[in-house]
């Protein structure tokens, strides 16, 4: 059986070691043939708390880790520019304090 993978965007990182990833799927409507986009939200395990809101990530299906969490972060494809700027500002603030 193949390992299921999805690519999506982190929309929430407020939980400890867990992020919510939104995956958008597009398909034609069966009757009207208009392209419909549907967003599915997955709770994914983030062991090191490295993901931030806006990051593009690849998630893979794994064993159940809790009642709703059955996916894990495989890799961070790209960091959001906002999160990268915030981390740079934090680093500068720490340098100024020292």
From Swiss-Prot:
Pfam families xref list: Ribosomal_S17
UniProt keywords, alphabetically: Ribonucleoprotein, Ribosomal protein, RNA-binding, rRNA-binding
Q: Which InterPro entries does the UniProt record give?
A: NA-bd_OB-fold, Ribosomal_uS17, Ribosomal_uS17_bact/chlr
Domain of life, per UniProt, equals Bacteria
**Gene3D superfamilies under this entry?**
Nucleic acid-binding proteins
An example Gene Ontology molecular-function term: structural constituent of ribosome
Q: Which GO terms describe its cellular component?
A: cytosolic small ribosomal subunit
GO BP field: translation
Does this entry carry the keyword rRNA-binding? Answer: yes
Database matches in SUPFAM superfamilies: Nucleic acid-binding proteins
Per the record, the similarity remark reads:
Belongs to the universal ribosomal protein uS17 family.
Role noted for this protein: One of the primary rRNA binding proteins, it binds specifically to the 5'-end of 16S ribosomal RNA.
Q: Which NCBIfam families did the record assign?
A: PRK05610.1 (NF004123), uS17_bact (TIGR03635)
What does the record note on quaternary structure? Part of the 30S ribosomal subunit.
* Protein's name according to its UniProt entry: Small ribosomal subunit protein uS17
This protein's gene is called: rpsQ
């Amino acid at each position: 059986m193949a390992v299921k993978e999805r690519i999506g965007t982190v929309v929430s990182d407020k939980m400890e070691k867990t992020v919510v990833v939104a995956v958008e799927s597009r398909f034609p409507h069966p009757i009207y043939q208009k392209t419909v986009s549907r967003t599915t939200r997955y709770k994914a395990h983030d062991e090191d708390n490295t993901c931030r809101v806006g990051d593009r990530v690849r998630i893979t299906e794994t064993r159940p880790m809790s009642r709703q969490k059955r996916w894990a972060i495989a890799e961070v494809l790209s960091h959001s520019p906002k999160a990268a700027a915030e981390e740079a500002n934090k680093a500068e603030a720490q340098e100024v304090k020292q």
